[in-house]
């Protein structure tokens, strides 16, 4: 059985919800994302293909690991009922770098603001959140017997975390949004031009019909008005991604594109 067929079969068997089964396209997109995490091209992926439980996501990951398609180091991390497949070593390295050098730009998009703005005021709370998450991930890594089950961070530990900010960091974005969720979950991005960055690659699997399969590895936005302020961190992120891409041979044809959109509302 070709590796692409194993990925598709694993998704259809483990991640099914109700009677609707995964299409080959959705299965291959997920497979490419998981491979990107395993290859160190991205630190984590947020599972959103359907409403499969964390246990189902872990079963899917276990199946791929048993077939030796991905390394056994990958883990399922559950934060506030959101399932992520993470590369622990890369995630830890990214979080440590963030604490040392503030490698991610934080953009305040509170609804009360007239326009988005880069903020330094929230670094104290963000630092505390990252330090707590690092402690959890390191603790999980010390229990090898627990690698085949989802690692859940209890609600009492993360109920005050700003998940919008955190997920942007965990997914490896060079900039992330912040808003005061104690006041409102709305933001000031409506009708504000946004530059959407996408990184797309092909799965070079060698299987018939798979080598040309294109998948979006990254997709995130930054306010157009802040392009001058975020140019340095964006350039560094792009260079780092290109360098990591050149160090592997599983995926090919990396393309990083940017386009500007203006939307009547933006959900974060």
Swiss-Prot record:
InterPro entries: DUF4504. It comes from the Eukaryota. Transmembrane segments: none annotated. Pfam families: DUF4504. Belongs to the UPF0739 family. This is UPF0739 protein C1orf74 homolog.
């Amino acid at each position: 059985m070709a590796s692409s067929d194993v990925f598709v079969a694993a998704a259809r068997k483990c991640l099914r919800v109700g009677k609707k089964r995964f299409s080959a396209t959705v299965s291959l997109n997920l497979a490419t994302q998981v491979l990107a995490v395993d290859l160190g091209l991205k630190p984590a992926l947020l599972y959103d293909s359907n409403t499969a439980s964390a246990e189902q996501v872990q079963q899917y990951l276990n199946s791929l690991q048993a077939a030796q398609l991905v390394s056994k180091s990958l883990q399922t991390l559950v934060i506030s009922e959101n399932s992520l497949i993470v590369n622990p070593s890369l995630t830890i390295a990214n979080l440590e770098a963030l604490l040392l050098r503030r490698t991610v730009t934080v953009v305040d998009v509170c609804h009360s603001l007239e326009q988005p703005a880069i903020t330094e005021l929230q670094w104290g709370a963000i630092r505390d959140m990252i330090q707590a998450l690092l402690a959890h991930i390191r603790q999980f890594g010390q229990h090898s017997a627990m690698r085949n089950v989802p690692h859940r961070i209890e609600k009492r530990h993360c109920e005050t975390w700003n998940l919008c900010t955190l997920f942007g960091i965990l997914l490896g974005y060079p900039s992330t949004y912040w808003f005061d969720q104690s006041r409102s979950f709305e933001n000031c991005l409506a009708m504000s031009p946004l530059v959407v960055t996408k990184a797309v690659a092909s799965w070079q699997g060698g299987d018939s019909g798979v080598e040309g399969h294109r998948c979006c590895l990254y997709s995130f936005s930054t306010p157009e008005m802040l392009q001058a302020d975020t140019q340095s961190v964006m350039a560094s992120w792009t260079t780092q991604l290109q360098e990591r891409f050149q160090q592997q041979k599983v995926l090919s044809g990396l393309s990083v594109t940017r386009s500007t959109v203006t939307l009547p509302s933006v959900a974060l």
